[in-house]
């Protein structure tokens, strides 16, 4: 890559420090044109790699900022290219002036994700590790961060490469035997291959099995609050997140749209979704909100059904209870500070789901709710072991394709098909797994993945 790129790598907001990153074969020429040491004698192009230097950035004869400059020579850098990082003052204008000076002196503005893309193209990391960079930045909880860091350090890469190494060995063996049948025999080989396919497919399926947990770790547990109008759903949301995010009134139907907030429970994120109260209505706007509530319930990992214990159950409650079928759900027996019109035992009997008495008004029952969520989703114990978690939808899709190809290999063996059939499907599995690492993907997909990154990353 001939161009030298630059971008601001820190947030564009006032802070103590801002970082401008430069990468490319002319990075040292660029910094030498604009940097002056305190005494004016140091030649920045001649300093050792991986060293930091105090000085100033100048635009011609105009002093721009007081800085620290980190010099890193290829190949031991993030991108694999000569790299310079300028630590300047973190004011928005100060950072922009330093960047403008860098661009005036030979660098080009980087595209979103271009530094990480160069790291991938220069062999510093595979595609799964490159994607993990963004996952680390976007991690919302302890386990998401740990999972992303493991992936960045190569956990997914190792698991996939181990499977691919076994497959390519047998692909090569079959091809060699077909080319030279006099010296390489395939007698009894299909049975040996069947055992290999069984073992490697078990590993593929094990990785796929982690994807549901991986998705929850990365994206949060989609937790939908359902109930009739004025049951206390918005009060519950405000109580869970610790602020008045939703409007709370005595007027039924106040919430008409979806409200989403994240909370962290024992290191795991819950995406709490407050919905419009379920009821039949002629109000067009409210009806749209109710329809959205029904849609969100279908997609939910967990439903919190808020019941106003001070009013009898009706047909709206019956509809909501139908929506709980086949779902993980907790019934919240709300407004326990008022005279009850229904008993918690009835709700337990009708739904089969656990019932927790709460009073959103008096802030009672929240600890019990958190414990119930932990018990329901994690068997009472949230732990993060050394298992590799698949958290990326692209990785999951590639594993599913590989799994299907291995099924075809097994079917061909069991039906006594010619050996070249084995080789074709083994190669398909091998290439689909390679997509995870970026070894079998097109330029368009690579560009699409990195276009989602932040500037300066």
State the predicted function of each range.
Residues 241, 276-277, 301, 308, ...:
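Short glycine-/small-residue-rich Rossmann-like dinucleotide-binding loops
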Residues 2-8, 12, 142-264, 281-283, ...:
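C-terminal-of-GTPase-core extension/linker across diverse P-loop GTPases
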Residues 108, 269-271, 354:
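Conserved beta-strand segments of alpha/beta enzyme cores
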Residues 286-310:
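Inter-motif core of Ras-like GTPase G domains
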Residues 53-65, 69-73, 253-281, 299-302:
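Switch I (G2) and immediately adjacent beta-strands of P-loop GTPase domains
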Residues 272, 306, 332:
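Generic enzyme active-site microenvironment
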Residues 15-17, 50-52, 299-303, 326-329, ...:
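Short glycine-/polar-rich loops that comprise or flank the Walker A/P-loop
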Residues 1-146, 150, 154, 330:
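A glycine-rich (often HGG/GG-containing) alpha/beta subdomain
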